[in-house]
Amino acid sequence: MEELGVKDSKKMTDEKILQIVPEIIKKIPYKSAILSNKEYNERYSADTNMNKLKAILHNKVLVQLTNEIKNWDYVIVDQFAQPFVYFNYLKSSNAVFKRITFLTKGEDKSLAVACASLISRFIFLKEFNKLGEQLDMFLLKGASDKVDEVGIKIVEKYGFNKLSEVAKLNFKNTDKIKEKISK
């Protein structure tokens, strides 16, 4: 993995991630869970925030992976919430995987976490590109005036409801798009 240059995905370009992750996934077992923007918007609410959604998805893949792979020593999760908060998010889940070591900045401390981060980013990039192809538009990532302009084009071409399928509506971009459209 080190030969491939595995490190924190935030320290790598998207191009490099797209190049090396196919090699990584040939060598290690993994599971993924994709939450579409539409599903995210339906589930996100006053009592369900992004960290709760992440906890639910992390737990889902950990349960699947550890059920399939019996020969493992420990599980590390890049800490995005305090452990008691993480497990509180899962209180209504049927199966909860609990044998977790939480590490802040886990990608810097664990090769396995760095690989998981890269695989997640790879899947995100592939899904993001598919979304752009479906819309017949080049989509931009992040938050900027240019991203807002693309959002406006989506609304003009497909209507505002389409935005809920391609964007997280609780982000500030949505308010800016609504404001610009209403002028």
Give short role names for the model-derived ranges:
Residues 1-183:
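RNase H-like, Mg2+-dependent phosphodiesterase core
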